[in-house]
Each structure stands twice: as C-alpha cells, then as structure tokens.
C-alpha cells in the first residue's frame, strides 16, 4: 500500500531505497519508487559500497555465519577497536542487528551467498565457515555453488586476510598480498585446546599463530560455539583486539535470537528455538543438545522454511 510510505520518504533528493531479494519486483511500494525515478539499490549493493569505504570484516558460509559475525561484532564493539556491524540476526547483547561507531575503520558484515549477494562485497578480511551446497534453486549444481565461493575469495583486498575453515572442498583464489589462514575446532592456524565441557559451562584455550589465550569461558555454552568462537576470535585478534578484551568479550556474549535460543529452561523442561534448516545444521544442533543434556529425552519439531530448500 503506497499510502503507508511516509511523506518524508517521497522526496527523491533525500531518499535512498534499499530492498532485499525477499521483496517481489511487483511489490506496490517498490513499484512506486521505481516508476517515480528514485535511487534504488539491493541491500547487497549498499553493503558493497560500505565495504569499499571501510575495512569490511565479512563472514560467509553455509552454516554459522550469523552467530560468528554477531560474536565477532561483539568482541570488537566492546574492545578499544570498535566496529560498525550489519548482522543477519538480532544480537541479544544489543537488541538489534545494527551497531554503529563514529571512529572505527571496521565494518562487520554477514556475507550472504543467496542470489550471489556476497559478490558485491570488497572484504578486507573474511571468514568462510562451510560450503555444504545450499540454495540450489539459485545455483543449480554443487559445482556452481563452490565456484561462487572461489570467486568470492578473489574479492578480498590486498593487505587483508582469508580465514578458511580447515578441510573445505572449495579452492581459494586470493589476490597477491592476501594472507590465508585455516581454523577449526581442533586444528589449523587458529584452533581450540584444553576444551572443558560440564555443568552447563564450556571453557577453552584459544591458540593463534602468535598468541594463546587460556581459560576462555563461552557466554553461550554450546559446543558448536567453540568453532564459531575460534573464527570470531581470529577476526578480532587480526583486527587488533587485545587478548584480555577477547577473553572478556567471549564471556559476555549472549547469543543471537533464534540461534540456539533458550526460550524456557528449568529442572524439568528445556525449550530451544534454533534456525537450522540444512541437514548438516540440524545434525549439529541435535549433537550440541545431546552433549549438554546427556540424560534427557530430545524431541524435535521441524518447520520446513522454504519448499525449494526442503526439496533440495
């Protein structure tokens, strides 16, 4: 309904219209802006413009990018480094998916591969968490999906870095001057050691090529957050956050809405909401629950989110 458009947004000189692929081209309000000559950009195009005017810290991958990018944003935001952040979920620390800074050169962005949106970005540094095929309604084949990630690595700017999950099937193709690191839970340039899980808590030691941070407590004690945390800490470390800032930030991280989100927790019942749609993600979620609650019965309610995604 174009009558819902605020009057101040009908001034072409001062209005930038930003939309996502979820908005149909025939949507009435989008049609109004297009037919009246407004400046219109996809969200991914705007994020691309932002990464060309700041140092983009981007997190891409089939799984884990929302939690990892939100965690990295929290680590930097509460450190002396600071950051701007455009996230794919609502941070429970801040109650928003947008963080601002007047002084930091860094912008944390969740790099979405849907519709090849991440090809608009110019990352300074990027994590790639996983490349299990997804969005096959867009890509068609596994090979095309992997190729899109290879092309994405060519966009990382010289002087920056690629932090690649160890063992991925894809081939990176970075420009000269881009440092390449690996990470995982247990091995790689960045990894965790001395992992302690028990009594609803997780402690780890973080190992980097040039430092080690001992006795880090995970603010959201879920086993998958060990790996997510290693990637987030790697980004924060390479961006200049101190060891103590990283340690404090990991302990104070409160998670993301709908990402292993505890809705009810008492002695009798634990109710979790988790946005896991890919088979690998669902398996990891169940594994994480089982590790935390070894003696409880697990009941799963699965909501198919998209027909094409569930079919593929």
Enumerate the predicted regions with their spans.
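Nucleotide phosphate-binding/pyrophosphate-handling subdomain across enzymes
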Residues: 198-200, 209-312
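Beta-strand->loop->alpha-helix junctions that form or flank phosphate-binding loops
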Residues: 41-45, 86-88, 177-198, 217-223, ...
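Phosphate-binding loop of NTP-binding sites
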Residues: 6-12, 21-164, 170-179, 230, ...
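Short internal beta-strands
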Residues: 162-166, 299-302
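A short, compositionally biased
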Residues: 166, 196-203
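A short, well-structured beta->alpha microelement
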Residues: 1-5
């Amino acid at each position: 309904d174009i009558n819902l458009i605020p009057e101040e947004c009908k001034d072409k000189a001062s209005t930038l219209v930003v939309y996502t692929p979820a908005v149909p081209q025939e949507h009435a309000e989008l049609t109004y802006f297009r037919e009246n000559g407004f400046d219109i950009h996809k969200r991914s195009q705007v994020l691309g413009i932002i990464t060309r005017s700041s140092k983009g810290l981007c997190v891409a991958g089939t799984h884990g990018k929302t939690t990892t990018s939100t965690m990295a944003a929290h680590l930097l935001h509460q450190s002396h480094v600071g950051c701007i952040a455009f996230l794919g979920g609502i941070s429970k620390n801040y109650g928003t998916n947008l963080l601002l800074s007047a002084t930091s050169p860094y912008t944390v962005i969740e790099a979405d591969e849907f519709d090849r949106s991440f090809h608009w970005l110019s990352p300074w540094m990027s994590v790639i968490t996983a490349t299990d095929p997804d969005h096959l309604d867009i890509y068609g084949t596994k090979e095309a999906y992997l190729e899109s990630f290879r092309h994405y690595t060519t966009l990382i700017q010289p002087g920056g870095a690629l932090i690649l999950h160890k063992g991925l099937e894809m081939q990176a193709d970075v420009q000269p001057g881009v440092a390449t690191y690996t990470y995982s839970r247990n091995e790689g340039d960045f990894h965790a050691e001395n992992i302690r899980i028990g009594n609803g808590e997780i402690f780890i030691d973080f190992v980097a090529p040039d430092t080690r941070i001992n006795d880090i407590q995970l603010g959201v004690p879920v086993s998958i957050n060990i790996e997510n945390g290693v990637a987030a800490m790697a980004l924060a470390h390479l961006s200049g956050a101190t060891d103590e800032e990283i340690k404090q930030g990991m302990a104070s991280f409160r998670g993301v809405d709908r990402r292993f989100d505890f809705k009810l927790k008492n002695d009798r019942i634990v109710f979790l909401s988790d946005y896991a749609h890919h088979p690998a993600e669902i398996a990891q979620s169940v594994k994480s629950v089982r590790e935390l609650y070894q003696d409880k019965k697990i009941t799963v309610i699965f909501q198919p989110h998209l027909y094409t995604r569930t079919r593929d």
